[in-house]
Design a protein with these regions (language model features):
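Flavin-dependent oxidoreductases
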Residues: 152-261
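Glycine-rich FAD pyrophosphate-binding loop
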Residues: 2-23
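A short coil-to-beta-strand element that immediately follows conserved catalytic motifs
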Residues: 62-65, 192-198, 309-318
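Short beta-strand to alpha-helix junction loop
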Residues: 35-46, 70-80, 115-135, 144, ...
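Proline-centered flexible-loop/turn and helix-kink motifs
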Residues: 3, 56, 107, 307-310
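Dinucleotide-binding Rossmann-like beta1-alpha1 core, especially the glycine-rich loop
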Residues: 27-101, 111, 229-230, 239-241, ...
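Helical element adjacent to the flavin cofactor pocket in flavoenzyme catalytic cores
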Residues: 115-171, 175-182, 357-370
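C-terminal catalytic lobe of FAD-dependent flavoproteins
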Residues: 257-259, 263, 268-373
Length: 373
């Protein structure tokens, strides 16, 4: 719609997809968990098909694996029915498996029953990102790396101050992930949330045990908790991962247990929303911390549905950090959030399934820009 416009992408790292986009389970989500009518539900359903179509068009390897959500006790069987109803409302094709049918599909997985989700897939989202960058540059776009944003202001357009100079633009879109609240604050607005970093620790199983499952295996989630639980995921590179957990990190880019950033810690521990969140989930907070420090505890969560896993099967694998948006009252933001200014739009909250939803999110941003210009 704007063929004469110039577009630049400012990337603070030396290359793309080094953080949340490149450090995740690689799952093309179907949209099982999300509140009907929410942006997450809509964009995930659209993104599932759009991501696969993009991969096919540009010859990016992916697999349509499907996914099993396994109930290991009667409480989870009950929650399974609620999840099935949500799938129905979100128009997600599913099949209910009995204990025997689950055993037939996955001989090494135990459970009382399962939900079979047919449209889930596996891909390397970093490869999608690099393909998008190549297409962007080929279309005349400009990509600046090692370009840390240090200021953002508005007056007759937007001015972005960076480590390599200043950029002026008619409109700015901020997709800063773990630093989204800081971008909003640069505009002079006080965000309704703060980003709290939760490290997701993964393990991979040895090569000889990679065939222990054929599909992604997830537990039935507890709707009272903000995370999905530890799962098994056959990755696009052939590895099989166990995880992630969700433990508070001491740095927004803290990928190791003792990685610390003083600024991040001051902002986090000075935020009332952190303590209200912990008070809301005291048991899970302590359990996640314990399992991060004590591998046998981590293992037990996976052994509930995959008893063949042993402690020696948990081999090192890179961690990720999830940008969790939390309000001052301790409540987590459940849906995608976009914060508008006169000449700017900041993606404020974009946790999972944002990678799956990336193409619909991009279309939504373009539509918002058209309205604002």
């Amino acid at each position: 719609d704007y063929p004469d416009s110039k577009i630049a992408v400012l990337e603070k790292e030396s290359r793309l997809a080094l953080h949340q986009t490149g450090r995740n389970s690689g799952v093309i989500h179907a949209g099982v968990y999300y509140t009907p009518g929410s942006l997450k539900a809509r964009f995930c359903r659209e993104g599932n098909q759009a991501t696969k179509a993009f991969c096919k068009k540009h010859k990016i390897p992916f697999r349509e694996t499907g996914k099993l959500l396994v109930a290991t006790n009667h409480a989870e069987l009950g929650r399974m029915q609620d999840l099935l109803e949500r799938c129905r409302q979100n128009e997600i094709p599913t099949e209910v498996l009995s204990q025997q049918q689950l055993q037939d599909k996955e001989p090494n997985i135990v459970g009382l029953g399962a939900i079979w989700v047919t449209t889930t897939g596996i891909v390397d989202f970093a490869k999608i990102t690099h393909t998008l960058a190549d297409l962007f540059i080929a279309a005349g776009g400009h990509l600046f790396t090692n370009c840390l944003v240090t200021g953002l202001s508005e007056s007759h357009g937007a001015t972005v101050t960076t480590s390599i100079g200043r950029f002026s633009a008619k409109f700015v879109v901020g997709c800063a992930g773990l630093h989204s609240d800081r971008l909003i604050r640069m505009l002079g607005q006080e965000p309704e949330f703060r980003i709290l970093p939760f490290r997701g620790e993964y393990f991979q199983v040895p090569v000889e045990k990679r065939g222990i499952v054929n599909h992604p295996i997830y537990p039935i989630p507890n709707p009272e908790l903000p995370f999905l639980g530890i799962h098994l995921t056959p990755m696009s590179d052939g590895s099989l991962t166990v995880g992630p957990n969700a433990t508070l990190a001491l740095a927004r880019e803290g990928y190791t247990r003792w990685a610390m950033n003083l600024r991040d810690m001051i902002e986090m521990f000075g935020y009332s929303g952190l303590y209200r969140l912990i008070r809301k989930y005291p048991g899970p907070t302590l359990t996640e911390l314990k399992n991060s420090l004590y591998r046998p505890g981590y293992l037990q969560l996976a052994k509930r549905y995959c008893p063949q896993l042993q402690l020696d099967d948990l081999c090192p694998y890179p961690s990720g950090v999830r940008a969790q948006a939390v309000r001052a009252d301790g409540k987590t933001l459940d849906d995608f959030l976009f914060v508008k200014a006169q000449h700017s739009l900041i993606v404020g909250n974009a946790p999972s399934p944002a990678a799956t939803s990336a193409l619909p999110i991009a279309r939504h941003i373009c539509d918002q820009i058209k309205e604002l210009l």
